[in-house]
């Protein structure tokens, strides 16, 4: 398991009762790679969870795009990430992702954790590629 995923899993366990939203759970572990302090990355992601607080674009995806942009990745890499997410989940909209989760009988936490952990692994791979 990569160190990003280990830290992401720790944050999603809500250490000390502190909730890290989906965006923060990616931005904080990747802070060093994008030239940020963890505290700044935490603050940056504060209002991107729960689809920017109103069920819009998935915070996991928006955080991943911020990370790719700050890491200097190209538009094609970002577009492919969005397209792959859309193909896998049928939507990029938090509200729709959560509705589909409820229909399957999966808890919101289980669903969001899965999205965050999967994206963490994808980001770790993308950030090590030379493109």
Segments predicted by a language model, with ranges:
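C-terminal binding/interaction regions
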Residues: 2, 76-131
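Acidic-glycine-rich active-site phosphate/pyrophosphate-binding loop
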Residues: 27-45, 88-97
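Amphipathic alpha-helical segments within well-ordered protein domains
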Residues: 27-31, 45, 49, 65-66, ...
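Short glycine/serine- and small hydrophobic-enriched flexible loop segments
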Residues: 28-32, 66-72, 121-125
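Polybasic, low-complexity association/targeting segments
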Residues: 1-15
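Acidic, glycine-rich active-site loops and adjacent beta-strand->loop/helix elements
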Residues: 45-52, 71, 82, 87, ...
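Conserved active-site and cofactor/substrate-binding residues in soluble primary-metabolism enzymes
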Residues: 21, 25, 39, 43, ...
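Glycine/serine-rich anion-binding loops at beta->alpha junctions
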Residues: 48-70
């Amino acid at each position: 398991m990569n160190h990003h995923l280990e830290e992401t899993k720790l944050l999603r366990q809500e250490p000390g009762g502190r909730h890290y939203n989906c965006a923060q759970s990616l931005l904080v572990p990747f802070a060093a790679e994008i030239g940020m302090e963890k505290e700044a990355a935490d603050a940056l992601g504060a209002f991107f969870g729960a689809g920017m607080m109103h069920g819009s674009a998935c915070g996991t995806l928006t955080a991943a795009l911020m990370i790719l942009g700050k890491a200097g990745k190209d538009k094609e890499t970002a577009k492919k990430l969005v397209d792959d997410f859309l193909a896998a989940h049928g939507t990029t909209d938090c509200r729709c992702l959560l509705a589909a989760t409820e229909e399957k009988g999966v808890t919101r936490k289980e669903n969001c954790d899965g999205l965050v952990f999967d994206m963490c692994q994808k980001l770790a791979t993308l950030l090590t590629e030379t493109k």
